[in-house]
């Protein structure tokens, strides 16, 4: 085996262990070593997309080779269509703004676990990536933290790049957009800013809720949105809540956001949580028994991020104690986390506690009766559902017998006003909150 073959085998083996199977198959395996001489390792890649990905791995490649040979090398990435080393290619014209925030190549549709809680969002995102600028434009994905919004957004970009590596995509957070806009005003480069954000095939903006109260930024984004939409360019947005619930967001911007397809992601159901854990375990090459997967999924019912965090905690605990992963070990590893998640407040729990407190049935809370002894507890339950959970107004309305989100908003406003002058109501709310959060 030559030195080049030996080094390449070490690099491949390292990434086969550290990257998911999908990433390895699609982005690592297609690379080919060309030669290794004078401290330079030339690696041939099939597309610019692959080269962008490997450039993010440079530090890891250098470390792997150093551990193997004691040499500090420099990787050069070349395209199969143009074997000239990257270092010798003419430099691109420098721009004040980044073309995009680097995408995570592991955020693909193949690695996203689909379930009832995200089925509509998944289908809409995939359709938008296959036919950008068409029926699903703009695409707005909203929901709580750690439920997969960013994963789906980047999966759209990765799929578009897979089909067309030269596609112009800009993926930013709303804060990135605002900072770039402010800097363009300070530096007098607004026209360049507009070219950067409008001469695109797709614009993806994460966390649009941070546009709230930013008047000039909202105006600039409104104009950018219109240019892209009129030119049939794909727009994808994410938010932690329904835009209609975001305070200090202009009506015309909310209207634009709701033009296309707004889809909500909610907390995953039990079977989806198990599938997520199983997929993560396979990706990390962990041997996790089914009873452990079920144990974790039943007790961590909030979001994907916490599920995966729990699994990694079990892994560290297993390695630290040099013991295989068992139900007993998992219980010990998650002792603190499980205690916290078992008290998660849900709409159903709120309805039950409020019904018990006011000596009525839960079916009265979700029903249509309009007598005062039922209407007030129902409004209190809606108010607490908004305050103690991450659910949107439409979701809350659905859980209260299919009420419209405006009915929920009215109930919340009424309780907020009444609690200012009703000491008894204040006391009731304090007792209910303490009971729910105990």
Swiss-Prot record:
Protein's GO biological process: DNA replication initiation; regulation of DNA replication
Gene3D superfamilies membership: 1.10.1750.10, 1.10.8.60, 3.30.300.180, P-loop containing nucleotide triphosphate hydrolases
Chain residue ranges for the region called Domain III, AAA+ region: 102-318
GO CC annotation, single: plasma membrane
Molecular functions per Gene Ontology: ATP binding; ATP hydrolysis activity; DNA replication origin binding; lipid binding
Positions of the UniProt region annotated as Domain I, interacts with DnaA modulators: 1-71
Binding-site list for ATP: 146, 148-150
Stretch list, region Domain IV, binds dsDNA: 319-438
Region (Disordered): 81-100
Localisation: Cytoplasm
Region span, Domain II: 71-101
Record-stated family: Belongs to the DnaA family.
NCBIfam families: DnaA (TIGR00362)
Subunit structure: Oligomerizes as a right-handed, spiral filament on DNA at oriC.
Protein name per the record: Chromosomal replication initiator protein DnaA
Organism, as annotated: Limosilactobacillus fermentum (strain NBRC 3956 / LMG 18251) (Lactobacillus fermentum)
